[in-house]
Amino acid sequence: MRVVRLLRLRAALTLLGEVPRRPASRGVPGSRRTQKGSGARWEKEKHEDGVKWRQLEHKGPYFAPPYEPLPDGVRFFYEGKPVRLSVAAEEVATFYGRMLGHEYTTKEVFRKNFFNDWRKEMAVEEREVIKSLDKCDFTEIHRYFVDKAAARKVLSREEKQKLKEEAEKLQREFGYCILDGHQEKIGNFKIEPPGLFRGRGDHPKMGMLKRRIMPEDVVINCSRDSKIPEPPAGHQWKEVRSDNTVTWLAAWTESVQNSIKYIMLNPCSKLKGETAWQKFETARRLRGFVDEIRSQYRADWKSREMKTRQRAVALYFIDKLALRAGNEKEDGEAADTVGCCSLRVEHVQLHPEADGCQHVVEFDFLGKDCIRYYNRVPVEKPVYKNLQLFMESKGPRDNLFDRLTTTSLNKHLQELMDGLTAKVFRTYNASITLQEQLRALTRAEDSIAAKILSYNRANRVVAILCNHQRATPSTFEKSMQNLQTKIQAKKEQVAEARAELRRARAEHKAQGDGKSRSVLEKKRRLLEKLQEQLAQLSVQATDKEENKQVALGTSKLNYLDPRISIAWCKRFRVPVEKIYSKTQRERFAWALAMAGEDFEF
DNA sequence: GTGCAGACTTGGAAAAATGTTC
DNA sequence: GAACATTTTTCCAAGTCTGCAC
């Protein structure tokens, strides 16, 4: 079902993609064209190459509170008998216990990894006893956490207020830093608490123990002359360094994948805002190059070199289908997912004819986060022929583009345009699509609600292009039904109001006095109001249905140049709060400061 | 080229906050 | 003002891409 829906929406998208593109109007960061008001905060500050700051001062990260042992009444059972666990073993048991209702705990890999790591935390005697997860009973632990969550929900107003104030205090104390003389918000000032690793899809490491991070694991980054953050009492930092070519404040190595995690600034900070702005400027710059790049890769489909042909076909997919680059992954370390360059023969099927089109390529693979990408696309004949060639005498597990890597692809792109990489195409195509869609869908005479539907639809076209999917919300059916009930009720009200208006009209005709006239006017206004409400409700229903399995957030936050949306709001008199929430407006402060209603991507 | 570490962006799910209805 | 629905924010996993060593 989902696949069919996406396919249909994609077909519509392809059609709209045929609309001729308007010539680029190029704006340079800081140029008059793109700016309105001073935007001074967003003038690029002159740091030499690679330097991110002159001054960085902060309080260090906030650590998860120490483990609180379970109360005596909450027991763990093994083979039906209560077993008292050591604190270390109990803590890890609670990580599993609190997840009992979750699907993860039904997965064999998760269970196996958890049990394996749990046993490492046990004392020798515990290990002697606890030998099989199937004989473990965590239900009391689970219930304890469920009750605890429920108790939090029913706290009194005062108690809730107190908790809120405590959180705010924490935010004030650890949530900000000073960067080059300005106070900036930190994105994630809390060190990740210990728990069980929740890898997505068929992740081979799911269920493994994510160790508790101690100050001794943490590297602090701050300026030499600043007040060095105090480690928690009785502890010390792994290292304190002063590296102003990076933006992170603190870092540690996570125990499951052995990768580095960072404390970084919030997206509303100047530093993050500037990089986002730069990213969109690079994508805008691509507008001026894209025609030539397209003609070049088309020419390269006929190259004598296999490597060049593969690169040209891959680039075509990246451009046309907004596929990700697809870096190589170590097998066994993560779920088996692919992007463009790592596609295997088994991920594509060639159809000489399908859906009434010639040369159809069927893609079916798991992309980032194990989200399935399924698409059937008619391609140009040389692409089709090349794919046949690339697949010749290969097994299903072989790489489709065996002569291509993301590094070589990006090296090539860099030669075509300064700063160009595979991902820029995603940004470029997402933003240009939003702009085109808004132009095609918005009508100036529409109501605000209808304009917002148009905006969401434009946003949705982009999300579908980028394959941003979500699980259907669990409450979807029910809430849809509620909405339908509401619509039905409103329809009845409208019918009733219409009848009343008819009666009032007759009454006025008969009486012809001022009183009946004012009644008539009142009835007319009522009908209008109800009709408007009905229209709004049905718009809501349409939007909801179309959005069932599409996630709009990622494209909105990462791929769509906010200046396009802001300009649209200004042009069509839609309050920007209808499009961006408070945090989103803070994140896009740079764009709000500079985009006028005539901004063009 | 290839492998790896590091730094940063992008991603959906889950939790929390807020709004609506009875 | 409780119960439920919806929206917003937080969380942290999973990508991209660069630079360096060999």
UniProtKB/Swiss-Prot annotation:
PROSITE patterns: TOPO_IB_1 (PS00176), TOPO_IB_2 (PS52038). The active site is at 559 (o-(3'-phospho-dna)-tyrosine intermediate). One of its GO terms (molecular function) is DNA binding. It is found in: Mitochondrion. Residues 1-50 form a transit peptide. Coiled coil: none annotated. Residues 268-601 form the Topo IB-type catalytic domain. Releases the supercoiling and torsional tension of DNA introduced during duplication of mitochondrial DNA by transiently cleaving and rejoining one strand of the DNA duplex. Introduces a single-strand break via transesterification at a target site in duplex DNA. The scissile phosphodiester is attacked by the catalytic tyrosine of the enzyme, resulting in the formation of a DNA-(3'-phosphotyrosyl)-enzyme intermediate and the expulsion of a 5'-OH DNA strand. The free DNA strand then rotates around the intact phosphodiester bond on the opposing strand, thus removing DNA supercoils. This is DNA topoisomerase I, mitochondrial.
